[in-house]
Amino acid sequence: MRSRRGLLIVLSGPSGVGKGTVRKELFSHEDTRFQYSISVTTRKPREGEVDGVDYFFKEREEFEEMIRNEKLLEWAEFVGNYYGTPIDYVEKTLQEGKDVFLEIEVQGAIQVKKAFPEGVFIFLAPPSLSELKNRIVGRGTETEDVIENRLTVAKEEIDMMDAYDYVVENDQVELACERIKAIVVGEHCRRERVAKYYKEMTEGL
């Protein structure tokens, strides 16, 4: 049984925890029907990232115009770059009964929760801070100063997990995906999500 309006599913966590890897693995599963909401960012593309697939890559001036025109559900500045979520796309997709999947930074997730408290907020946690550092170093794209900055921010973000509905440890990507899928199935069956549909159905009898 599924609720008729789509769910807004927000996956968030520290930089380097593997949000992108988990999201790509989830979307490779045939039994998932998520609609990925592509974020807008001003950071430079990493190797293998494609504009319009992984992110919409914008210049700072373009992003700031979107802020002024209130075209973003949320936005945040993280390590010198902007990140944001286009609002019109999200609401339209939810109304169509599709689940919208957001993979965003922690600051952005907190903003989204204020605007969409009925969303499903999942904090992706690392097995340990040492493992998180290994993953960031393994990218080979960050300077030592940036790595240390990201770890400092990560500690602050882990302290913010109380704002989330669920915490999923990313010890193994496949296991993390199965946990997230189980969360979504359960959320679709929550009484408060399906009650309105059945109330309308019985009123028509």
From Swiss-Prot:
EC class (word): transferase
GO molecular-function term, one example from the UniProt record: guanylate kinase activity
Keywords: ATP-binding, Cytoplasm, Kinase, Nucleotide-binding, Transferase
Annotated Guanylate kinase-like domain residues: 6-185
GO cellular component: cytosol
Main localization, broad class: cytoplasm
Known EC number: 2.7.4.8
Binding site for ATP: 13-20
Subcellular location: Cytoplasm
Catalytic activity from the UniProt record: GMP + ATP = GDP + ADP
Role this protein plays: Essential for recycling GMP and indirectly, cGMP.
Similarity-based family: Belongs to the guanylate kinase family.
Protein name: Guanylate kinase
Organism: Bacillus anthracis
